[in-house]
Amino acid sequence: MSELNKIALEIINNGKGILAADESTGTMTKRLESVNVPSTSENRLLFRETLFSSSSMKECIGGVILYDETIKQTSSKKNKIPDLISSMGSYPGIKVDTGAKVLAGSPNEKITEGLDGLRERLKEYYSFGARFTKWRGVYNISKDYPSKLSIQSNAHALARYSILVQECGM
C-alpha cells in the first residue's frame, strides 16, 4: 500500500474525521474579538494549542487542516504545532489554495487560485510536517451555472493541484 493510501485510511480509521483549523488571520480575529480577546499571534496560538491538546483529539480526529501561520508556529512547550498534532495521533495537513476569485469571462463564477509557486510551498509544508492538503473548488449551482468555462477551468486547476500534491508526497 502506498504511503498516501496509508495516511488516507489512518485519517478516517475508527470513524475519525478531519478538523478544519485553517482559519485565516482575519477569521480568527473576528472569533477572538467576539469574546473580547485581542487577536495577537500569541492568542491565536493559545487558542489552537488548546484545541490541539484536547483529550478528544486522539479519539475523534485523524487529521487537522492548518493555515500557513499555524504550521510554522511553536507551542508554549516549545513543540512545533505539527509535532503536537502528530503526538495526539493525528496527521497535520495544510490549506494550500490562496482563495477564490472571479473567473475571467464569467463574472458570476469563481476560480480557485494558488497554483503559482505551489510546488515550492508544498515542499516547505512537507518539511514542516504536513502530510495532506486542502484545496477548494467553488461552483455556483443553478439553472444557468456552472458554465462549461467554469467546469473546465476548475477541473484544470484541480488536476494541476492534484499532480503537484502527489509529486510532493501529500
Task: Name the predicted role of every residue range.
Residues 118-170:
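Helix-rich catalytic cores of soluble enzyme domains
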Residues 1-128, 141, 150:
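Alpha/beta catalytic barrel-like cores
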